[in-house]
Structure formats: C-alpha cells, structure tokens
C-alpha cells in the first residue's frame, strides 16, 4: 500500500483480499467471533498509510469487508479517530444471501455500481464484501467518468483492466513463463501494476517508475488468460468480449488495451458457497531405493487391512504415488519416492485415531526403510467451494454512504446480445479435433505447411498460465509471433492436450480460441475436485498445470525455433 501511494500519481487505490478460500477462512473466524469476518490485514496496512492517503487525496476501495463489511467500516472509523485522520467511510452490502442447508457462507458476486455510488457521495474509503475482482475498477471508473449502466464498451474496457490488475505482480512479470528473459534484479521484487483508464474505456497498464518487474504485451496477455474461460467474460455490470481485446506496446513498461466490446450482463449473478465438507487427514510414506512399486503395494494392503479391522473406516480413501526417485541417486532424497494417503470422512474419529493408529502400527512391520514425512495427526476439517446462480433482481445491493444513508442499487440492465456484435460462433476448425467457442473471429491462419520438425518442450515456443475456478482449471496458452500462432491453433487441439496431460483422463475439456491475443484457453472441468479448500490433488489450485504443459515434448517446425 505504501509503495503505491508514494511511487507516483494515483487517484484510486484498489485492494483485492478475497480469494475463494479466503471466505471459508473468514466464515470460520466469524463462527468464533461474530464481530470478525473481515480481512484484518487491511486494517494493519491502513494504520500505516491512512494519513498518507488522506494527504495525497487518494481514494481507497477494497473488498476486505469479506463477510462483515459494516464491521470493517466501523473499524476503519475507529482507526481514523484514533489516528486523528478524518476520512469519510462508506461500505457496500447485500452480497450475503440466505445460507443453503449445511453452508458456511453464501455470497453473490456484486458489480461496481455500489462502489460508484459511495464515491459519488464523497467517500474517501469504500469497503465491500464479495464483489467481482473487476468491480474494484469498474466502480471507480464509472464514478470518475459518470458512465451510465448501459455504456457497455466503456465498462467492458474497465473490466479487462480490472482483470489485469486483480492479481498484482502477475501482470508485471511475476509467475511469468518467460521470466528467464528478464534481468534477475527486475524480478526480485516486482512492482504492482496500475491502469490509466480513459473515458472510452481504453486503458494503459503500467507501473510506478523505479519499481521492479516488467510490463509488456506478454505479461499482460498471461494475466488476461488467468482464471478465465470463453470469449465472453460475464460479470454483474457487463459481459466483456475477450476476443475483441487488442494489446499494443505504448512505451517502456506500458501496454495499451483497446478495442474491447461489451454486451449486457447475464440475468443472473454468480453465488459462491462454502461449507465444511468433513474431516481430512494425510500421511506421506517415503519409499527409498529399490522395489518402489512393490513397497507401495505392500503399504496399501497393510493400511486397507488396518482400516478393515477398525471400528470405523474412512469413507473416502485415495492414494497417489509420485515417482520422485532416481536410479543410482547420489543423495537419499533423490533416491526416494512419495506415496500419499488422503482420507476424508464426516466423523473426525475415522480420519484421526484410525489413520494415526494404522501408521504407527506399520512403523516396525512394513517395507524396508519405512518412514513418513511427518508424524500422523488428528486430522482437520476441510472446506468445499461450489458455485450457484441467482436472479440478479433478487439481490438487494445497498450502498451505505458516509452520512449513514442507505442507497438501494438496482441491478444493471439485463438483455440479449449487444447491437453491432454478433453472437458467439464456432470457428471453422474442421481440420482439428477441438470443441471451441469464440466470437466474431478474424480468419484463422492456414495450416502450417509440413516440413522438418524437432522434438522440443512446448514451452520453447509458447507461454502458459493456469489457475482455478472452483473445481475447474483453466490453462491459457499463447504465442508470441504470428508464425507460432499459425502452428499452435492447429497443433494443440483438445486431443493433443489430453495426450500431453494424461491426468486429464476422461474429464470434460473445452478449448476456446482468442485470435487477437494469439491464444488458446483450455478449461478442464473437475480436475480439482471440490475446489482448493478440499485439497483433492497435488497442486490443489492448478497453478503449475500450465508449466507442466510447457514441459511436455512435442514436434515443432524447425522454422519456428529461431
């Protein structure tokens, strides 16, 4: 926060504190103390920077209110009084919905209209509960430029800018596939991105001078593809057409975003629901040296026998063998594979004493070299995230203004496809095995003429970034030249993707084509089970799937390797 306030000119400072997992954590906090439920980190940061923001005239907008935006607004007022820094505080509420049976939290994803109303009423600080990440930008932009709710193109441009900003340094070189091309000193501490937004919704992504990191079309493309799905990026304010986005260099560490078209938002709002799924425990057995497969089979049978003899057996048992071992290894660690046991049950006894008892029993009676990475534990509760949808008109969004007045915020106008932009259509990909949804596409390049190829990692020619949405994973893959794009769009089909990533198995995979970005976006449904909080697999948020894909070896035309 201090870096952004002191690094250069700024009108509005935004803060995104709410990942899907965060609301589950805040829900558990609120069970212990109903006065909690908001991100306390925001208050700690604000204590150091409130006076600075006031002095520089910077408005602050953050979704740190979590499950208790009114409580956070009160806490900010108390902080303001204690520091003797007078500020006008407002908050947005109405996202909290009646809880379905067994749910811990249920929150609709609101748009930026409530934020805009608070700013129009003179708020210096606006805190919200669950809003879309992009709403932290669309709200201030709509206030600043006095946009109406049907100025879809401008709002869509702000949505795209907000999506680029939402994950901070991921737009300035953080977690970037081609990081080795940058000077190491620039990556030690990447600066945060900022957006210069114009009245027509176009923007320039940049960063404060002198901060670390890099902003170029590659870093912005990577973030644009992160945690998205098709060409239509639907939100509560507008549906942004990602297939219309154009990125152009605008000087050092500056990328211009233009051409974004918008449509009316869908008639429903997304609702994030979290609940305690039950109890979970995990034991990781270390298998060192020879006969790894046989050792794994022995311990599986021994644990199954122990469970069969126990009074209560875990309802869900899964095993995963990771062959991290190497032959003739020079260190013990390199000679070892890991066998991961995960159990789940509604009864803590079934995942606690039963599992720890089985593991202890094996300590002197199992495979040679038996040991585990950590002592068996009692287990712990785990969370589950799911998404639902509710009619937008049924959600009563309210802006609580600095005066205390409550302003009802109507739902944005809903409707059909925006005039001037046709409906999504299937591109002509008859030559490739792909299910693809894209909109008003420019012609795809012809198939690259056959010629000599070389077996190289896919990442030699393309970048990738992956992320999670509930139990799904998206993998965005992009080319950096027209020639590579012409090869990529025809070569990396859904069938190819499945072959490269066997873990995908029989799951549904959808491929989306974004020609303006020279990019493909693959969505794998259900790869993460019930979401990050359930920790269903290694890499529970799917962050490394893109880099795994890049590491896979494919035949690439020699002409593209440079």
Regions found by a protein language model. Name each.
Residues 18-36, 54-56, 95-102:
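Gly-rich Lys/Arg/Thr-decorated short loops/hinges at beta-loop-alpha junctions or inter-strand turns
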